[in-house]
Amino acid sequence: MDYLFCGDVAQRLGITTRRVQQMCKQGDFQGAKKDRGLWRIPENAISEDLSEKKKPLPIGVSDFKAATTSYYYVDKTLLIRDFLDTKPMVSLFTRPRRFGKTMNMDMLRVFFEKTAEDTSIYFRDKQIWQCGDFYTQHQGQYPVIFLTFKDVKCLTWEETYQKIRILISLEFMRHSELETSQTLTTYEKEQYHRFASDKVTEVDCQMGLQLLSLLLHKHFGKECVIIIDEYDTPIQQGHNYNFYSEIVNFMRNFFSGGLKDNSHLAFGFLTGILRVAKESIFSDMNNLKTNSILDESYSEYFGFTKEEVQDMLCYYGKEEKYQEICDWYDGYRFGNTEIFNPWSVINYIADKCFPKAFWQSTGSNEIIGEIIASATPETTENLYKLLCGEKITTYIDTSVIYPEIQSNPYSIYSFLLVAGYLKVAATYPQNDGNFMCDVAIPNKEIIFVYEKEVLNRTNQNNTSISINQAIFSRDAKMLQFLLEDFMLKSISSMDGANEGFYHGMMLGLCAILGNRYRIRSNRESGLGRFDIQLMPLANDIPGFLFEFKYTKDARENLESLADKALQQIDDKKYDTELRNAGVKSIIKIGIAFRGKN
């Protein structure tokens, strides 16, 4: 049989060598093999239509077998190697939604689970199989319990409990081999039947993991692997819909029975967005190893790396779109690894490379809404600084809990970070195991999410457009009317507590101009720091400078105070940066505030 190298095949098919290498990895050439680092491809495996034949993208696919056999699959199987190298008793992976958690957990299930099917066929062409017998000897050797709570999104505790109970029952039914087991006692089979037929109480359900692991251990003679995917989805629902204590109490007992001091457990895996250690769900569980977005371990296995995105673009013949895909969907950093949002990347390529905010429609953005609704003036100003492309430095607590959103101002940034709305630009480890971090908005997609939530939550959209029209037309009376009308409808008498509040409010109202201006806040220019500057992105529109004054004194004249703000712009030469940038027309605006005036 004659073999060709990648360069020869690329020339014959009229595609790049890199694309041929990618097709080899994907198994598109039957019989292709790697020899001394070079792919050798059977000549009879090459046909002209191969250059056009491409696997579909796995949009909405979380089934590992289906993904690897019928779709373009990004190989994440070395996660198995890294786990087996250290083998903690229970591993918790915390990542944002739609970053591949469920797919990876199903991969672990297929790898470890002992079944009648030879499931090694799904791994023989993957990277894990090249790592040697130390790793492959674990394939297909364990009974596995697998539960995913990703769809437990109910509005009441009663509905939530019912759905969890059904999921537990279905997992018992999946292990139908226990029904005819020769090693189980009559009583144990009766217990199995009660769960499989969904005839259990809430207390029974809390013992479900412990019981099923006992039965499987006894039947197979091997300890169990327990996998719980998206364990905190029902906890978030509990916070949003006022059954938080009920779900936390249930989960505490449920996990304690299955994962703490369970002699029938080989090892366990959990995924979620939050660690929630403070909630005592994992109280006293000293066998738990948490892997957060700040940790270096496993950093490349959730989401796509730069190289994986380049390979994918190459496979689909879209190499020229790399910079655009970086601008829109890159920017995350897990540990020290640069990561792209995988859901958005595959949707972008499938949607003919038209960029838009794919991720925002995949789940609730209520966290942002709640943060905005309860934000202090300082928090509001910081959120708008982030929206304008600035970084802020803040304490990050990776074990943040949902009720702290309103009570702990530092928790806001921790929530936004672990949920995928912020990226880490730099980390400064603290003695308590947490971090001080420089954080920023990761990419254009998330800017759209912020803008949508900020404007919608405060009902600003139409008002913002009108206010900006008044600014552009230099209509001071209309601007005053619109601002007062907005404040009357949108803020309480307690909100206007300091100048920082009004500063943040104005930043938010200017956010709609982000596609025409670089919006800057509290930056040095001339002899001091301006409040807000709008640096035009085109030469044919004016630049803007805003200076704000605030008073509580009802006797003080607001017009005189606004004049002082305007004079400060000139005295401090705040227009220096705009003039140095070649901006010819500069509009200076001084505004004074008192309460809702």
Report residues per predicted region.
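Structural signature of nuclease core domains in nucleic-acid processing machines
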Residues: A476-N597
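Phosphate-binding site recognition
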Residues: K54-G500, I512-Y517
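Short, charged/polar, Gly/Pro-enriched secondary-structure boundary elements
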Residues: A45-E52, E445-V449, D540-P542
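Short beta-strand
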Residues: G31-K34, A426, I519-E524
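Polyanion-binding surface elements
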Residues: M1-R19
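Residue-level detection of the helix-turn-helix DNA-binding "recognition helix"
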Residues: Q21-Q26
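Short helix-start
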Residues: C6-G7, F29-E52
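The DNA-recognition helices of helix-turn-helix-type DNA-binding domains
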Residues: G27-D28, F111
